[in-house]
């Protein structure tokens, strides 16, 4: 039996993790969760899975749940509550499925508590990869990727030595607007942006997919997860999202991981690693039915956010923190209808250009840079 905490239980990754726990009651038990403000969802999870601890981000939701479950479930609040859920003593694996940089400190505390990390919050490594990976090594903790692309690379590298790797290739669908010109992108709507052709995901990551910032963040995450320089990390457009990523070795051999676009697969693999279990209600891959797979080179002028991510990643230091914070604020403004789609990349670039570089920022400096960048982007609105 593995005991699971889910940070971000009401989101897309969180709810799919619950599906897996539900499907394998003899393998997994839910011990702790965090939610934002969805009281009904929290009630449903408590009634079905009986977690020992529930962390709540929003004050009104916290007060409601605390009064309802007094003496039955420990209800905790805010960042301290999130940290408590992450480091819960009875937990073996922490699924970090919260969105954004809010996941950084709880992930570090979970690592310090010796928990295995099922990493779905890519911003943790983007903003503080040097700190997180050093902490994981110090405490002997595994960082198991949940992103489909990183899970694919992780699977392709099983039994292989890193010095055999020529490069890794992350595939990208191209998102909602892959066939639109730059001119057409000027007037796209939020509703259009949220229609991803292949994957069912949360709003923020769907917009990131449309701008290709999601792939840029994944490039930075891959740099830290697999300890490879950016020159050995490529991106390939692949419309069908069947090949989730590839590894090319020094002898020119290529190993790829294939599957239908279903996030249950990489989530379950992170929970069961190194074992594999049957996946309930999964559609097996039928290549004859699909018949044809397509691949294209990435146009970095077309996908400016991906270029910005490569540049920030290669520069390192504090720039990835600025990249991430500026992107989060700009995407939020776009989702609220306050800025145009292409203004997202404009605000990110402006934030990067004005930032005073810090080479190896401390955790406190990262938090200050994150907050200052957010204030700057909000001032542009």
UniProtKB/Swiss-Prot annotation:
Job description of the protein: Catalyzes the NADPH-dependent rearrangement and reduction of 1-deoxy-D-xylulose-5-phosphate (DXP) to 2-C-methyl-D-erythritol 4-phosphate (MEP).
Which coenzymes or cofactors are required? Mg(2+); Mn(2+)
Alphabetized UniProt keyword annotations: Isoprene biosynthesis, Manganese, Metal-binding, NADP, Oxidoreductase
- Give the protein name, as stated in the record: 1-deoxy-D-xylulose 5-phosphate reductoisomerase
Q: Which residues bind Mn(2+)?
A: 147, 149, 218
Q: In which pathway does it act?
A: Isoprenoid biosynthesis; isopentenyl diphosphate biosynthesis via DXP pathway; isopentenyl diphosphate from 1-deoxy-D-xylulose 5-phosphate: step 1/6
The record's listing under Gene3D superfamilies reads: 1.10.1740.10, NAD(P)-binding Rossmann-like Domain (3.40.50.720)
């Amino acid at each position: 039996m593995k005991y699971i905490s889910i940070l971000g239980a009401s989101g897309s990754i969180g709810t799919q993790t619950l599906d897996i726990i539900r499907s394998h009651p003899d393998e997994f038990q839910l011990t702790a969760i965090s939610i934002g403000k969805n009281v009904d969802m929290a009630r449903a999870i408590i009634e079905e899975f009986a977690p020992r601890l529930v962390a709540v981000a929003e004050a009104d939701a916290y007060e409601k749940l605390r009064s309802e479950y007094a003496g039955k479930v420990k209800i905790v609040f805010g960042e301290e509550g999130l940290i408590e859920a992450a480091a819960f003593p009875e937990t073996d694996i922490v699924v970090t499925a919260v969105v954004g940089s809010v996941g950084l400190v709880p992930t570090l505390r979970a690592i310090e508590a010796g928990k295995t990390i099922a990493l779905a919050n890519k911003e943790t490594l983007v903003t503080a990869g040097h700190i997180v990976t050093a902490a994981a090594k110090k405490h002997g903790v595994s960082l198991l990727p949940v992103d489909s692309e990183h899970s694919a690379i992780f699977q392709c590298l099983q039994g292989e030595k890193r010095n055999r790797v020529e490069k890794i290739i992350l595939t990208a669908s191209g998102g909602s607007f892959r066939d639109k010109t730059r001119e057409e992108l000027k007037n796209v709507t939020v509703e259009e942006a949220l229609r991803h052709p292949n994957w069912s995901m949360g709003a923020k990551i769907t917009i990131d997919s449309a701008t290709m910032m999601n792939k840029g963040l994944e490039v930075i995450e891959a740099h830290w997860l697999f300890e490879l320089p950016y020159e050995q990390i490529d991106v390939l457009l692949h419309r069908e999202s069947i090949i989730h990523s590839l590894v090319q070795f020094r002898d020119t051999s290529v190993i790829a991981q294939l599957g239908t676009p279903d996030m249950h697969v990489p989530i379950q693999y992170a929970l069961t690693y190194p074992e594999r279990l049957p996946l309930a209600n999964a559609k097996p891959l039928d290549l004859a039915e699909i018949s044809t797979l397509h691949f294209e080179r990435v146009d970095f002028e077309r996908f400016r956010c991906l270029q910005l991510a490569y540049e920030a990643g290669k520069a390192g230091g504090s720039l990835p923190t600025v990249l991430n914070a500026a992107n989060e604020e700009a995407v939020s403004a776009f989702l609220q209808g306050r800025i145009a789609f292409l203004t997202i990349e404009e605000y990110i670039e402006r934030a990067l250009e004005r930032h005073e570089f810090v080479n190896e920022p401390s955790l406190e400096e990262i938090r200050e840079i994150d907050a200052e960048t957010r204030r700057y982007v909000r001032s542009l609105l």
